[in-house]
């Protein structure tokens, strides 16, 4: 005679226990007891054959052991590479900084500046020339992204402690180190005025861009005055003498005169006068970046 039975429950493992497998024997025994109780409660009908119940229980028990063993192996295998990855790839935030950056940050009294390539020859040949403009890139402790020295493709790094001595100091201390340079007629005025005004410039530190530009413009005009005066008297030509006398006048007065004659603005007339001065064929000075040639390259 056939009888029907209903399966009110299935043997299963808890998801939390599956996600955290353990190799402890006590935990495994507790899981087995839980499976036995679940299977006994689910198959409580007397109409089901005892052999079928036993076979079902054995199959569930064996499948549970196989699944648990496979899962434990996979979990152990998956945990091992995570540990190695954490050991091989440390957090980049906690990496040790560059030694040069650390040394620079420790020594806050020494400033470091990025010198443009146009100033290489000037800093090398004229050690008494010191530029203190407001737009000079200073790298100090406030800099967050400190680049390496190899990334500076536009110029070298120049520290304030590496600036050599001034010209007069080096002449008194080490006169033999300076190479002998021929003294030109039109360079004496430039040398004398530069030495006289050097102390006045040092009194105004730090120099702003406006003061620096005004000083360079004044020195440029004075150099042109002396140059045209020397060449005019040397060639003994009336035109050169007249040209030198015109250059010796103030640039602002010439600009005002040109603006009155040509009905132009003073700023435009001033630009025309300066451009006209730059067209007089001097290979010694060129703009926009100021290049001063060496005395050995000047034709007497």
Swiss-Prot record:
InterPro entries: TASL. The modification Phosphoserine is found at residue 293. GO terms for cellular component: endolysosome membrane; nucleus. A motif (pLxIS motif) lies at residues 289-293. It holds the Pfam family TASL. The keyword Phosphoprotein applies. Keywords: Cytoplasm, Endosome, Immunity, Innate immunity, Lysosome, Membrane, Nucleus, Phosphoprotein. It is found in: Lysosome membrane; Endosome membrane; Nucleus; Cytoplasm. One of its GO terms (biological process) is regulation of toll-like receptor signaling pathway. The keyword Methyltransferase does not apply. The phosphorylated pLxIS motif constitutes an IRF5-binding motif, leading to recruitment of the transcription factor IRF5 to induce type-I interferons and other cytokines. The pLxIS motif constitutes an IRF5-binding motif: following phosphorylation, the phosphorylated pLxIS motif of TASL recruits IRF5. Innate immune adapter that mediates the recruitment and activation of IRF5 downstream of endolysosomal toll-like receptors TLR7, TLR8 and TLR9. Following recruitment to endolysosome by SLC15A4 downstream of TLR7, TLR8 and TLR9, specifically recruits IRF5 transcription factor via its pLxIS motif, leading to IRF5 activation and subsequent expression of type I interferons. Plays a role in the regulation of endolysosomal pH in immune cells such as B-cells, dendritic cells and monocytes. Interacts (via pLxIS motif) with IRF5; leading to IRF5 activation. Interacts with SLC15A4; leading to its recruitment to endolysosome. This is TLR adapter interacting with SLC15A4 on the lysosome. It comes from Bos taurus (Bovine). The gene is TASL.
């Amino acid at each position: 005679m056939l009888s029907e039975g209903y399966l009110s429950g299935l043997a299963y493992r808890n998801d939390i226990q599956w996600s955290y497998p353990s190799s402890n024997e006590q935990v495994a025994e507790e899981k087995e007891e839980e499976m036995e109780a679940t299977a006994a409660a689910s198959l409580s009908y007397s109409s089901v054959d005892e052999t079928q119940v036993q076979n079902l229980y054995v199959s569930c028990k064996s499948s549970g052991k196989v699944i648990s063993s496979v899962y434990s192996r996979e979990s152990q295998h998956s945990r091992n590479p995570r540990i190695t990855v954490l050991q091989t790839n440390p957090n980049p935030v906690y990496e040790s900084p560059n030694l040069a950056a650390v040394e620079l940050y420790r020594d806050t009294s020494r400033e470091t500046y990025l010198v443009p390539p146009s100033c290489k020859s000037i800093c090398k040949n004229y050690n008494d020339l010191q530029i203190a403009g407001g737009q000079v890139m200073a790298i100090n402790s406030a800099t967050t992204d400190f680049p390496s020295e190899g990334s500076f493709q536009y110029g070298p790094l120049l520290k304030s402690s590496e600036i050599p001595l001034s010209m007069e100091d080096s002449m008194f201390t080490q006169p033999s180190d300076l190479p002998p340079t021929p003294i030109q007629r039109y360079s004496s005025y430039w040398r004398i005025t530069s030495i006289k005004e050097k102390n006045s410039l040092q009194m105004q530190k730090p120099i702003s861009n406006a003061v620096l530009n005004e000083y360079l413009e004044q020195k440029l005009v004075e150099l042109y005055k002396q140059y045209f005066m020397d060449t005019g008297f040397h060639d003994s030509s009336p035109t050169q003498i007249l040209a030198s006398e015109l250059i010796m006048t103030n640039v602002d007065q010439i600009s005002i005169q040109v603006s009155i004659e040509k009905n132009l603005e003073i700023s435009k007339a001033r630009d025309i006068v300066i451009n006209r001065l730059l067209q007089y064929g001097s290979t010694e000075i060129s703009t926009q970046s100021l290049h001063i040639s060496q005395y050995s390259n000047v034709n007497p």
